[in-house]
Every structure is written in structure tokens, then in C-alpha cells.
């Protein structure tokens, strides 16, 4: 008569064990795996090193500070699976296939650069895999009809929009702009956006000309530009031609109120090479250490904040790369912010289903240490704002937008004669 009671008693420990195991499983879902064909060697190795450091920094923040990704009633940790694509297109395609079919990752982060990102997109699309772009700025990536490609870095056409907005606000009498840039797809895309925005704002484009890659003498172009007497110049393409552009402007004594050069002017090596000639020169950047995006700024703007503060990110980055002297640049910041965007999207979707997460990304609006996030229907980033930096007394100062600036712009910039005499570009 008492055997059933005894049997129940004997079964009780097993039942308790089952419940505990089930609860533990519910509280700790399987890791969410980010796959990445990273540029660890080859021509994009420096940018790739920064990107990996940014990703690992924000993964650590998610796992250790945020507690993981809310999913299935628990908190799922993030895991990171990367391979070296050697900055080669053929490696990108094969590695994306491997990450999806062999490693069974939940999302693929694109490699650095527009070319590599575009090469990998059809592979991810063919597998129905979410493909997040942190380093491909070319707008053409988002004109191919890809459903699963989503951008974190701002598009090339947005590079000089802030520069033009700034000049219109601080110098409403400035009307004449000259465009002189490298004949490359990237620079042409940047200037296409600049030209359209300049016309929208009512500026007169008094000069527009390109120069070939690898140019060694810009004297004929700059002489023709000088004759149009522009108020300001938007130019450049990459580091070497940007440096040449500035140096030969000084040689020809071409003075303008503002000179903004893409790619070159934001690099420390630019000032190191040119010294006082670089004073007052500006350039657009996706992110700079010193921006003022913060939890308080997000609250004031009525938007959600996620992630570490800027200083916390820098500390996490240094730990990730194992170098206490390395400062993260925008390659690290945009890659790290991409981790945060994915985490929020999974949290909002409540599932790892790719279509649900992609839909959540389309509805997402938030701020992080990198700035604002918002994408259009094609996946193109439209929320992030470029920052403009200016060399002032040998230091890079963020001068635009006002919400991120660490100092006021110096406008007009000193003349080359004044700079040769020791005058600094101070507001």
C-alpha cells in the first residue's frame, strides 16, 4: 500500500535535478555566434586590427556588463568566430560560406572596405544570412537589392554634408565652393553627395575637376582653381594626394577660408608631414576620440542609449588589442557599434530568426559612443552623422556637429603666409 509513496519519494531527486537543469538551460541560452572574415593581413590589416579590437571590446561589454543578450527567458553570451581573409576578395567569399555552413554562425560581419564588403554580400544573401557592414561606405552596395545587408558606417555621399552645413551656419556670406578630387570611385561618390548637398544649400560650384590616381603634380589644376577665387575647397582622395594638394596650395599661395580634405587630413601623419601648413585644414571622419555622445545626450535627445561610454570603450579596446598605447580610431568604433546594434535587434526581435532580426534592425533607433543609428529600407545608414575635425595648434579638434564638438571651428583659416610666420588656427 505504501509502495507508490516510496516510488514518488525516490523519483523526487530526479525531478528536482530535471527542473534545475531545465531552469539553468533557460537562464543561459547557447552562445550567439558572430562570424567575421577579418582583414588581419594584407593591405587592410591596420583597419582590420582596429575593427577586431572594437568588436572584441564591445562583445566583452555585452557579456560582462550587459549580462548577455536577453533571449529565451535568459541571457545569451556572445561568441566571436573570425578568420583572416588576407584582404583578398576570393578569400572573403569562401570564408563567408564556411562561417555559414560549417561554423553555423548567427550573423556575419563584413570585412573592411567597400570592395570586399560588396564581394561577400551575394554569398550571404544566397544563404539568407544577415550581413552587417562596418567598413564599406560605397552607396552602390545598397543599390543592388540585397535584403540582408545592413550598414553601420555612414555612406560615402554623406562625408561632406556636415562640412557644408557648418559653413552655411557660421559663414552665411560664403557662397563659392571648389571641388577638386581624385578620379576614383570612392572620391567621386563622396563628391557626388557633396555637390548635391551644396546645391541644395544654395552654394555656387565655381570649379569641379578630378585628377588621376598617383598624381605627382597638381600645379595646373590648382592654378585653374585659384582663378575662380572660391571661398572654400572640398577635395582629396587618399593620404598621398591630400598631402600633395595642401603642399602645392602653399607653394602657389592659394588662400581660402576653409580647406577640407577626405581621408588625409584626419590622420596624425598629415600634420607630422606638413607641420604648420596643415594648421586650419579640416577633414570628415566617422568618429574621433573626444566626441561627446553620452547617456545624458541620448536622454536629452529622447533616444535609447546602449553600450560603454567613450572612455570605457577605449579601455576595453586597449585590453582587447593588448596595447595600452593604442587609441581606437573610427574603424574600431564603427565595428564595435555594430555589435551593439545587433544585440538590440535580437533583443527586440526576441529570436535569432534572420528575417525577424533584419526587421528589428530596420525599426531600430539608438545612440552609442559612436553616435546615432538609423537605416533606410535598403539597409543604408542614415542616422549616423560624420564629425569634422580641424588641426588647431597641432591638435585635432572636433568642430562639427555642435552636439559632438570639442572646440569651435577656426574660420577663416590663417593664410599660408600667416602660418609660415607661426600663426595657429585658433578660433
Regions found by a protein language model. Give the residues of each.
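Short, low-complexity disordered leader/linker segments with a strong preference
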Residues: 1-33, 100, 420-427
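Hydrophobic alpha-helical
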Residues: 114-125, 230-252, 338-341
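Immediate post-signal peptide segment of exported/extracytoplasmic ligand-binding proteins
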Residues: 25-36, 69-77, 168-175
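Segments of small-molecule ligand-sensing domains
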Residues: 317-333, 341-400, 405, 426
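Extracytoplasmic "Venus flytrap"
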Residues: 32-58, 83-89, 112-113, 180-188, ...
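Extracytoplasmic ligand/sensor domains, especially the bilobed periplasmic-binding protein
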Residues: 53, 105-208, 257-292
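Beta-alpha junction/loop-to-helix N-cap segments that form part of ligand/metal-binding clefts
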Residues: 33, 46-53, 65-143, 152, ...
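Extracellular/periplasmic periplasmic-binding protein-like sensory domains
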Residues: 249-336, 398-406, 414-426
Amino acid at each position: 500500500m505504501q509502495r507508490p509513496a516510496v516510488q514518488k519519494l525516490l523519483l523526487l531527486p530526479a525531478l528536482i535535478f530535471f527542473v534545475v537543469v531545465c531552469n539553468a538551460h533557460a537562464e543561459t541560452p547557447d552562445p550567439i555566434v558572430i562570424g567575421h572574415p577579418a582583414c588581419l593581413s594584407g593591405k587592410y590589416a591596420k583597419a582590420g586590427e582596429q575593427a577586431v579590437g572594437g568588436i572584441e571590446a564591445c562583445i566583452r561589454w555585452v557579456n560582462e556588463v550587459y549580462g548577455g543578450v536577453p533571449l529565451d527567458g535568459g541571457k545569451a553570451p556572445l561568441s566571436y568566430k573570425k578568420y583572416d581573409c588576407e584582404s583578398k576578395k576570393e578569400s572573403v567569399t569562401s570564408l563567408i560560406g564556411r562561417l555559414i555552413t560549417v561554423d553555423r554562425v548567427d550573423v556575419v560581419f563584413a570585412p573592411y572596405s567597400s570592395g570586399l564588403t560588396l564581394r561577400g554580400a551575394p554569398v550571404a544573401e544566397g544563404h539568407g544570412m544577415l550581413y552587417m557592414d562596418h567598413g564599406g561606405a560605397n552607396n552602390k552596395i545598397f543599390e543592388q537589392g540585397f535584403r540582408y545587408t545592413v550598414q553601420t558606417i555612414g555612406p560615402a555621399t554623406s562625408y561632406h554634408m556636415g562640412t557644408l552645413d557648418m559653413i552655411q551656419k557660421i559663414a552665411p556670406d560664403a557662397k563659392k565652393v571648389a571641388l577638386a578630387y581624385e578620379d576614383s570611385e570612392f572620391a567621386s561618390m563622396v563628391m557626388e553627395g557633396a555637390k548635391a548637398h551644396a546645391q541644395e544649400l544654395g552654394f555656387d560650384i565655381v570649379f569641379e575637376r578630378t585628377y588621376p590616381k598617383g598624381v605627382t603634380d597638381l600645379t595646373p589644376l590648382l592654378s585653374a582653381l585659384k582663378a575662380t577665387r572660391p571661398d572654400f575647397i572640398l577635395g582629396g582622395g587618399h593620404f598621398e594626394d591630400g598631402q600633395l594638394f595642401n603642399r602645392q596650395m602653399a607653394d602657389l599661395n592659394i588662400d581660402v577660408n576653409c580647406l577640407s580634405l577626405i581621408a588625409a587630413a584626419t590622420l596624425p601623419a598629415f600634420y607630422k608631414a606638413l607641420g604648420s601648413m596643415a594648421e586650419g585644414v579640416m577633414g570628415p571622419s566617422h568618429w574621433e576620440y573626444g566626441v561627446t555622445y553620452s547617456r545624458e545626450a541620448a536622454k536629452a535627445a529622447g533616444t535609447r542609449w546602449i553600450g560603454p561610454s567613450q572612455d570605457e570603450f577605449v579601455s576595453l579596446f586597449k585590453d582587447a588589442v593588448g596595447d595600452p598605447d593604442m587609441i581606437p580610431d573610427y574603424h574600431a568604433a564603427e565595428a564595435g557599434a555594430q555589435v551593439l546594434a545587433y544585440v538590440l535587434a535580437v533583443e527586440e526581435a526576441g529570436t535569432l530568426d534572420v528575417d525577424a532580426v533584419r526587421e528589428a534592425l530596420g525599426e531600430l533607433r539608438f545612440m552609442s559612443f559612436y553616435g546615432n543609428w538609423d537605416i533606410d529600407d535598403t539597409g543604408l545608414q542614415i542616422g549616423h552623422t560624420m564629425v569634422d575635425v580641424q588641426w588647431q595648434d597641432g591638435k585635432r579638434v572636433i568642430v562639427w556637429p555642435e552636439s559632438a564638438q570639442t572646440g569651435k571651428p577656426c574660420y577663416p583659416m590663417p593664410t599660408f603666409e600667416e602660418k609660415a610666420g607661426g600663426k595657429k588656427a585658433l578660433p
